[in-house]
């Protein structure tokens, strides 16, 4: 027991030291009013934006020298409307290219600072890389990464997921060349920190539900699941879509009578799909929420449908107490909870292909397998 307490104290000390270090760092999110103003500043400082602005000089000369105003007008309109599109595309490609050339340094910073899945651990990494990119002329400003979360997301999309999906060493060398050993070392450090976080999180039982005996699932409060779904998807964000639909029905006379109800059906299915995806996006804001979900599945004593009902109750209470969800109705019942795990966790793991706007959860693969194994054992028991 004393050894475990000492290990936990050491891990807590490490976390506190990392938080103190992150407090000293200054990132663009601390300097700019918002991410939009930061993005505008980055665009303004980019070479492609300056080239676009310089294009107006020969165009203005052409306007003065030309006798026919039609051709200068057409070219000016093209530059005016399509210019910003090309600026944005080339700007994003240049960011991607600059980052791909600095993968080795990216990995060295990860190995040095040992960040975990907590976004705060990435603040030092983001600040150091911002300075390195600017000093070594890899980027023309000191603000490549806006925040620690953007740095962590870049690590996930540039290194973690692409490298983990490579099947053999030859494919890794072909894609990442000389950076392979540095990437392997960085991923090993990252996975070690995530494992520490999981063990600490799973052993301390940092959260336990209180008064769960009185908790009820939404299936007990609503007569039909459709009622629960409609309540979730019919909110203020849907108001513009409904106004558009009412405009088509009552004002426009060009639409056929069949198209109107068909539009409503399609709209309903789109909103239902977005609601399902939104739940996973909300859960993915913090890794600890996903870890809590997997830990709850693994540690559940009940089996079968009753077990999933208990998991749904615990997660509904947890997400409400952590202010992730506005009420205790995240999961409708155990069946909905089981579908959520199978669809957003195990299916992604089996296919090893990310869904739109959702990550692969590479660092959670061992725990997803463990959760699936515990579910299989419970079903056989």
From Swiss-Prot:
InterPro entries: DUP/COS
Pfam families linked: DUP (PF00674)
Transmembrane segments: 43-63, 70-90
Cellular localisation: Membrane
UniProt entry keywords in alphabetical sequence: Membrane, Transmembrane, Transmembrane helix
GO biological process terms, semicolon-separated: protein transport to vacuole involved in ubiquitin-dependent protein catabolic process via the multivesicular body sorting pathway
Family that this chain belongs to: Belongs to the DUP/COS family.
Protein name per its UniProtKB record: Protein COS6
Organism the protein comes from: Saccharomyces cerevisiae (strain ATCC 204508 / S288c) (Baker's yeast)
Record gene name: COS6
């Amino acid at each position: 027991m004393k050894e475990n307490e000492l290990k936990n104290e050491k891990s807590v000390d490490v976390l506190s030291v990392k938080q103190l270090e992150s407090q000293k760092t200054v990132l663009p999110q601390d300097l700019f009013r918002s991410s939009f103003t930061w993005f505008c500043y980055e665009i303004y400082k980019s070479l492609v934006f300056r080239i676009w602005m310089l294009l107006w000089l020969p165009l203005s000369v052409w306007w003065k020298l030309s006798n026919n105003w039609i051709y200068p007008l057409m070219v000016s309109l093209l530059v005016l409307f399509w210019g910003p599109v090309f600026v944005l595309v080339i700007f994003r490609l240049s960011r991607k290219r600059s980052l791909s050339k600095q993968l080795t340094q990216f990995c060295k910073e990860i190995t040095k600072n040992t960040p975990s899945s907590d976004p705060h651990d990435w603040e030092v990494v983001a600040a150091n890389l911002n300075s390195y990119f600017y000093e070594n002329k890899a980027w023309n400003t000191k603000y490549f990464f806006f925040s620690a979360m953007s740095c962590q997301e870049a690590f996930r999309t540039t290194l973690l997921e692409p490298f983990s999906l490579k099947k053999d060493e030859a494919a890794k060398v072909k894609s990442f060349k000389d950076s392979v050993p540095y990437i392997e070392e960085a991923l090993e450090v990252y996975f070690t920190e995530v494992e520490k976080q999981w063990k600490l999180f799973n052993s301390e039982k940092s959260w336990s539900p209180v008064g769960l005996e009185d908790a009820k699932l939404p299936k007990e409060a609503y007569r039909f699941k459709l009622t629960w779904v409609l309540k979730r998807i019919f909110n203020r964000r849907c108001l513009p879509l409904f106004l558009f639909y009412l405009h088509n029905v009552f004002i426009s006379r060009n639409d056929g009578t069949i198209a109107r109800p068909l539009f409503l059906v399609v709209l309903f299915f789109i909103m239902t799909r977005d609601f399902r995806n939104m739940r996973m996006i909300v859960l993915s804001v913090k890794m600890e929420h996903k870890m809590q979900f997997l830990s709850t599945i693994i540690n559940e004593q009940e089996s079968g449908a009753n077990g999933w009902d208990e998991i749904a109750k615990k997660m509904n209470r947890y997400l409400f107490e952590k202010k992730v969800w506005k009420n205790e109705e995240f999961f409708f019942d155990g069946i909905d909870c089981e579908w959520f795990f199978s669809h957003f966790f195990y299916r992604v793991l089996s296919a090893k292909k990310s869904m739109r706007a959702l990550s692969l959860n590479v660092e959670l693969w061992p725990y997803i397998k463990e959760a699936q194994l515990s579910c299989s054992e419970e079903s056989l028991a």
